[in-house]
């Protein structure tokens, strides 16, 4: 027990680990909340596209001497808008357009990076460097994540209805176009906030895994938000602590933990129906008047 306590408490003695844990929790919360909407909307590939497309914006921002988050955000929004325009003005399907746009922008970013002299490691951009996050970068992450969470919470029901049934949202008078591009902007902001933690490649796992895990084991969207947040925060904290002890990359450790949680949820999702079928005759015998299935909101 003392050894376990030492393993958990030892990293907190270092200031860089304190910053890393705070960044992990904040990143985990904002990614988990947004992942529920992405899973409900079916935008897994959109998150992947924008996360890869921010690379040229980061490189150009560094070259111009402006904050990297501005370049990343503009680049991500350009990818989303270009994808929507090409989809609406051509016969090509959306997933095909996204594949071409994000791969082209990612390749363009790699070429730009190879032509610019910088002491910045490409691996830190691609895979993140949470243990090396500075106080300024942490404050930046907190501001972006806080703004994103505030907007999502204020428009929670509107976004939920838009993701679940955009036609119904349009019929009742919701600004569907505004919600569409608003969600894209929030997605781009979330990716920017997560860059320091897991980089442009692995951020898609944090934007999908918590939501799909919660989707498999929950019966309502509110439950889904809570479970996704818990899963994401636990995975981020555990991954950060494990990376400290094994001297490994933080981003991949976090994603591995989330992948393990997904396997557990998948097994639970297969076992629960079997258990319910076995318990059904016993439940009916004990309480024959209350055998109707429940419909949770």
From Swiss-Prot:
Transmembrane regions: 20-40, 58-78, 96-116, 133-153, 172-192, 197-217, 224-244, 248-268
Cellular component annotations (GO), alphabetically ordered: ATP-binding cassette (ABC) transporter complex; plasma membrane
GO biological process annotation, one example: transmembrane transport
Main localization category: membrane
Keyword Transmembrane helix carried by entry: yes
Domain of life: Bacteria
Localization terms from the record: Cell inner membrane
Any matching Pfam family: ABC-3
Membrane topology listed for this record: Multi-pass membrane protein
Keywords annotated in UniProt: Cell inner membrane, Cell membrane, Ion transport, Iron, Iron transport, Membrane, Transmembrane, Transmembrane helix, Transport
Keyword Iron: yes
InterPro entries: ABC_BtuC-like (IPR037294), ABC_TroCD (IPR001626)
Disulfide bond sites: none
Purpose: Part of an ATP-driven transport system YfeABCD for chelated iron.
Family per similarity comment: Belongs to the ABC-3 integral membrane protein family.
Protein name, UniProt field: Chelated iron transport system membrane protein YfeD
Organism in which the protein naturally occurs: Yersinia pestis
């Amino acid at each position: 027990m003392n050894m376990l306590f030492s393993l958990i408490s030892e990293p907190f003695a270092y200031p860089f680990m304190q910053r890393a844990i705070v960044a992990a929790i904040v990143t985990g919360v904002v990614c988990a909340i947004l992942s529920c909407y992405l899973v409900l909307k079916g935008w897994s590939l959109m998150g992947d596209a924008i996360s890869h497309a921010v690379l040229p914006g980061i490189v150009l921002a560094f070259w111009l001497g402006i904050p990297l988050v501005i370049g990343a955000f503009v680049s991500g929004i350009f990818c989303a808008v270009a994808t929507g325009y090409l989809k609406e003005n051509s016969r090509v399907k959306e997933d095909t357009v996204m594949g071409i746009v994000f791969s082209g922008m990612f390749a363009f970013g790699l070429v730009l990076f190879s032509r610019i002299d910088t002491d910045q490691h490409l691996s830190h951009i691609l895979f993140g460097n949470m243990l090396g996050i500075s106080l300024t970068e942490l404050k930046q992450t907190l501001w972006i994540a806080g703004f994103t969470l505030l907007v999502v919470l204020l428009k929670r029901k509107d976004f939920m209805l838009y993701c679940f049934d955009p036609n119904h949202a349009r019929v009742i008078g919701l600004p569907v176009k505004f919600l569409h591009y608003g969600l894209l902007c929030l997605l781009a902001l979330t990716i920017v906030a997560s860059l320091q933690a897991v980089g442009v490649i692995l951020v898609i796992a944090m934007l999908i895994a918590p939501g799909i895990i919660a989707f498999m084991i929950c019966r309502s969207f509110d439950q889904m938000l809570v479970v996704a947040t818990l899963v994401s925060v636990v995975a981020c904290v555990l991954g950060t602590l494990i990376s400290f002890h094994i001297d490994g990359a933080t981003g991949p450790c976090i994603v591995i933990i989330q992948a393990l949680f997904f396997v557990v949820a998948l097994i639970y999702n297969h076992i629960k129906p079997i258990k319910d079928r076995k318990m059904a005759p016993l439940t009916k015998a004990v309480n024959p008047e209350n055998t109707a299935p429940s419909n949770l909101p």
